[in-house]
Amino acid sequence: MAVKKQFANFAEMLAGSPKPVLVDFYATWCGPCQMMAPILEQVGSHLRQQIQVVKIDTDKYPAIATQYQIQSLPTLVLFKQGQPVHRMEGVQQAAQLIQQLQVFV
């Protein structure tokens, strides 16, 4: 389950997380991103003890999207100890996404 939080520094938030952080880079106008929302809820619930899910609206935070070279939406990036360790682009099925993430948690 994604939690709405304010943060002053994205990198500090990632580095300070005790769990790996799955970042969903999305936009409100993106149809495939809207398809991913319930899938991410399901994955977040299934892996809630192992990962934290964060959503970043690329229209509101273009500098973060540029920093991580986000060129297509949705893009999911798994960060561990502040560093990107896995990247997925496009709509993912819940079972496949869980299987991919479990390798890193």
UniProtKB/Swiss-Prot annotation:
It comes from Synechocystis sp. (strain ATCC 27184 / PCC 6803 / Kazusa). It holds the Pfam family Thioredoxin. GO terms for cellular component: cytoplasm; cytosol. GO terms for molecular function: protein-disulfide reductase activity. Disulfide bonds join C30-C33. Keywords: Disulfide bond, Electron transport, Redox-active center, Transport. One of its GO terms (biological process) is cell redox homeostasis. Belongs to the thioredoxin family. InterPro entries: Thioredoxin, Thioredoxin-like_sf, Thioredoxin_CS, Thioredoxin_domain. Residues 1-102 form the Thioredoxin domain. This is Thioredoxin-like protein slr0233. CDD domains: TRX_family. The keyword Transport applies.
